[in-house]
Amino acid sequence: MKRLTTFIAGAAVAATLGGCQQPAVSGWKSFSGDKNIERRVDSVLSLMTLEEKVGQMAQYSCNWDVTGPVMTGDYETLLKQGLVGSLFNVYTVDGVRKMQEMALSESRLKIPVLFGYDVVHGYRTIFPMPLAESCSWDLERMRKSAAIAADEASASGIAWTFAPMVDISRDARWGRVMEGAGEDPYLGSLIAKARVEGFQGGNDWRSLADVNTVLACCKHFAAYGPAEAGRDYNTSELSQNTLMNYYMPPYL
C-alpha cells in the first residue's frame, strides 16, 4: 500500500510538473506590465531543467554560529546548483549578501534567491504582539507598525515576511493566540488588511517594487486556528457555516 501511495503521489507530481517543460507565463495576466520582463521570464523558463523548476519551489532554513548564518547538510551545494528558491532565517546584510552572491555567481542561470523571515511584531523596533495591538482597534497605527517593520527588514535584505497571522482564535489553550487579532472575524479582517498594506506599501501590488516594502503572507491555512484541544498542528472539526462565517473572512 505504501508503494502504491508513493507511486500515485509521484505520478501526480510528474503530471503537474509536466506542463513546466514549456514557458508557462505567456497565458498569464501580466502583473509587471512590462513585456520585456515577461519575455525574459519566458526565456529563463525555457532554459530551466525540470530539477531547477522544482528547486525554485524549495525553501531551506539557515542556522547560525558565531560568524553568521550557515547552511546545514547539502543546502549550500543545492544553492550553488540553482536548486533553492528561497531561504528562511537569514537576517543580516552580510548573511544575505553571502548567500545571494553564492547563488548569483555559481548557479547556472543566476536566479536570485528570495529571503524570508518571521517579522511578526517589528524587526529592529519592537512593537506589541499582534493580539495586544488589536485591542487598540487603531488600524492606522497597526498599518504604520507594519510599514516600519517592512522598512527595517527590507534594509537587511529581507523581501518576504511570514505575517500577518490572520487565524481567528477562540480557544485560549492554543499557544499561538497572541500572533493574531483575537476571536472576532470582522475586526480580524480589518486588521489583516491594514497589516498587509503596511508591509506592502499600500493596496497596489506595484508598491512591492519599492525598496522599503516586503511581500506579506497571510497565514496560516484557514481553520488552522481552531485546532482541537488547542494543540498546534492538530485537526479541526467544524461545520461549513462556521468555516465561512468565522474563519474565512480574514482571508477574503
What do these predicted ranges mean?
Residues 15-252:
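Glycoside hydrolase catalytic-domain context in secreted enzymes
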Residues 1-3, 23-24:
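N-terminal accessory segment at the very beginning of proteins
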